Amino acid sequence: MMQRVVLHIDMDYFFAAIEERENPELREKAVVVCMLSGRSELSGSVSTCNYVAREFGIRSGMPCSRAKKLNPEAVFLPVRKDFYTSVSDRIMEILRSYADPGNGDSFEQISVDEAFLESSERTGGDFRLAFEVGMQIKKEIKEKENLTCSIGIGPNKLISKMASSAKKPDGITVVSPQDLEAFLWPLNVSKLWGIGSVTAGKLQEMGIVTVKDLAERDVIELISIFGKSRGTWLKQAASGIDDSPLKERDGSEQIGRIATLPEDSLDKKLISSLIERLAGDVIEKLDSRELSFRIVTVTVINSNFRMYTKSRTLSHPVSSKEVLLQVSGEILDEFLSENRTEFRRVGVRVGGLQKKKGQKSLFDY
């Protein structure tokens, strides 16, 4: 059986890098790309920033006003989503050309700036050839888009994803099956892809600090604490085992809008009005592409910049604004009953997309 080879490509500080490319004078400056709310000049949160900005402690997700305090001389720019997406589309086409041909999915875009691709057939399972493929990818992206990326190469998605972070920016890291333990086991367990802060905290309470500690624990003990599925996964992941396939499905795409309220509020009428506007924009986008949806997600960000998300899956695909508003309203009611901190931003997103096949009645949902 041929050795599996998976590459994970992660564009380096993508939005900020594009801005540097468009304006080379920014390269030596701290560049901060912000999702601005429109309330005031720097009301919003940091989408991404370059490495110069990170040296000042600026990070994605923090309020732009705080970033300004950390570095008053930084250059703050608004997100240009459509422009970034057009660049992303061209890069993804480059990456697709390096994925294995033949049957099955061999390419998986997981965000605007990162993707997996399978290169088992192209390389014959040889990780030395995979390194050459990775270098070719980096060279082509640099020549055509004047941008850099970091690449991880491993025997599965888990390892390649973690490897791409090892030498950022503009690095390439190969982890062959023989190198798994040397690469994985010294890492803090919180660095294992798929482990969040809650799980990491529980593991550390059990005395599990490194990935090696986790790999050496009895799977029965892990299952007794985390459940069969999660406990088994933890044991396998710590050993570098991951047989998950690459998947590129029509339904994996999502369309959404998010905006800032005129003022922090828990007023249902005010929030519902914004949701109606966002839903209208989403439906307009769906209609232009003749798509229906099956998953509705509402996101709220409160005045403390904590984000909460709830989703509903419908029995079958729809394309009705009326349905979107009804389901979004039900989710909003749940948020309002659970939260006492005022909302700052609200978002509406749909997933499970597919081409329209007709529309049933609202009462079917």
Curated annotation (Swiss-Prot):
The record's annotation in SUPFAM superfamilies points to: DNA/RNA polymerases (SSF56672), Lesion bypass DNA polymerase (Y-family), little finger domain (SSF100879)
- Provide the residue positions that the database annotates as binding Mg(2+): 10, 113
List the catalysed reactions. DNA(n) + a 2'-deoxyribonucleoside 5'-triphosphate = DNA(n+1) + diphosphate
Q: What is its EC number?
A: 2.7.7.7
Q: Which GO terms describe its biological process?
A: DNA-templated DNA replication; error-prone translesion synthesis
- Which note does the record give on the cofactor? Binds 2 magnesium ions per subunit.
Against PANTHER family, the record matches this protein to:
DNA POLYMERASE KAPPA, DNA REPAIR POLYMERASE UMUC / TRANSFERASE FAMILY MEMBER
Q: How does it assemble?
A: Monomer.
Which named protein is this? DNA polymerase IV 1
Q: What is the lineage of its organism?
A: Archaea, Methanobacteriati, Methanobacteriota, Stenosarchaea group, Methanomicrobia
